[in-house]
């Protein structure tokens, strides 16, 4: 069922500028769960990864990475508390089944990923091998 939802979201996003989603649970600094309406009275829960950003891993390779990962997660929780309606733009399927990549636009119009990058809690990422967070 999850892959059907991802296909529906990817199809819809090609014809709609933004897909509204209701934030639910924040997993880490660049991934959260959200509810998306795919039909009247039909909402699905989908994992959303912020596009074009890399944040430290929660189970990182060193204490410094884990600390920064927690800071990034806490900041994303501040930006999109449970129940916040955000807009998902540029939706694409992710390498992990059941997850999508999207630009997440906050109620004030800012891009959540860009906020984290500007606050040094994440860095730009366009695919490929990621740089480490440990010195």
Description of each model-found segment:
Residues 2-5, 11-135:
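Small beta-barrel nucleic-acid-binding modules, primarily SNase/OB-fold domains
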């Amino acid at each position: 069922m999850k892959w059907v939802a991802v296909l529906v979201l990817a199809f819809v996003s090609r014809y709609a500028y933004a897909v509204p989603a209701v934030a639910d649970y924040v997993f880490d600094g660049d991934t959260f769960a959200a509810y998306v309406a795919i039909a009247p009275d039909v909402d699905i829960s989908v994992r959303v990864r912020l596009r074009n950003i890399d944040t430290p891993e929660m189970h990182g390779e060193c204490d410094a990475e884990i600390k920064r990962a927690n800071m990034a997660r806490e900041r994303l929780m501040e930006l999109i508390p449970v129940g916040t309606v955000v807009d998902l733009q540029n939706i694409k399927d992710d390498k992990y089944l059941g997850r999508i990549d999207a630009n997440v636009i906050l109620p004030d119009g800012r891009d959540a990923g860009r906020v984290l990058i500007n606050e040094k809690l994440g860095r730009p990422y366009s695919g490929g091998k990621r740089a480490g967070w440990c010195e």
